[in-house]
Amino acid sequence: MKTYRISPAGRRTALILLIGALIIWAFALWTFRTTLDISYNPIEFWSTLRQKIDAGLSIGQIVPALLMLVLIVATPLVVWNILEEWAAAYTPEEDGLRFTSLGLELTYPWAGISAIRRVDEDSDEPVDEVVFKEDYTRQIRNPILRFLHGQAYGRTKLPLYAGLANRDELLDEIRQRAGLGEQPIGIEPEAAGDLSNA
């Protein structure tokens, strides 16, 4: 059984994205602190924040602080997505497509795959999604990992990244084993049916 992983070029791209996300997160933490003039010392954080709120905040403080708070919360989720892509491995097996990454191990039965669709046709490096008939994330016992994986991909989809080595070979094998036929790459299943009727 062959396992498909992100190529070295894909890993370099993921590393650049990861560094960028960490820089954004550090900037958001610094800007949030300086905008509200609070301390990040665990003992003083809540008391200094409460003092600033009780003293009253101006619009010039509230708007940037809220934007930075959104970045502080959202950026770690983006970092998880990038790390999960970095460690992603796809293995076609007899009973289905096995996906592993960062402690996750999911097996998607071949009969549970309903389609493969291209996410962005116009991209230089397109990403395809494997669409499932139902939610298989219940195989993940850890609720935190289940949430993180679900927010990264959705519960009924699994991306096949542009940086995946031998991606077209994997796509062909998935189509063959799942009985999806010779659906042209990049065409929605409905559109592929329309082409065959033309």
PLM segments and residue spans:
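Acidic, Ser/Thr-rich low-complexity segments on the non-lumenal side of membrane proteins
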Residues: 100-138
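A membrane-cytosol interface segment of integral membrane proteins
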Residues: 122-198
